[in-house]
Amino acid sequence: CNSYRVVDLGVMVSCDRILEAAERERADLIGLSGLITPSLDEMTFVAREMERRHLRTPLLIGGATTSRVHTAVKIAPGYSGVTVYVPDASRAVGVASNLLSDSLKTDYVAEIAADYEKVRVQHASKKGPSLISLEAARASAFAADWKHYAPTRPSLIGRREFRNADLAER
């Protein structure tokens, strides 16, 4: 694929199988793709396991459930190697080229690290919803006046049949 050899391990592959294959194949990069929400936690686990095993292979994160914020806040902090969010499969070749280039890698990795740090700071500074006390909520509760409410009468009560309606026309 674009002069890169890709080893596709399939779907729902365990962390051990991924890392064993990466070591056996002497992978230059490890790519994870998450299509369902539980994949997010598994990606974080893989990054922490790579750290525990002292691996330094760049980790590429992609897939429908992933995001730059999740990668920067949850995945990258668990791995001291390079972790890069790849928003679209079409960008994987460019990311791989940057990470495998002796002349581009250092600046590219520094740029990613600076961006992720900024994302983490912004994420940490976000305030949660401001909450009010139960007493204040009860004091400002909606007071319905059902005695003086007159519901609007629907224009049709019952059922309406549409005969000779061709559903293929729509």
Annotate each language-model stretch with its function.
Residues 35, 85, 168-169:
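Generic alpha-helical structural element
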Residues 4, 57, 81-82:
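A structural micro-motif
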Residues 1-7:
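Short helix-loop-beta junction
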Residues 90-170:
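Active-site loops and adjacent core secondary-structure elements that bind or stabilize anionic groups
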Residues 65, 70-105:
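Metal-dependent DNA phosphodiester-chemistry modules and their immediately adjacent helices/loops
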Residues 8-77:
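Cofactor-cradling patches in redox/metallo enzymes
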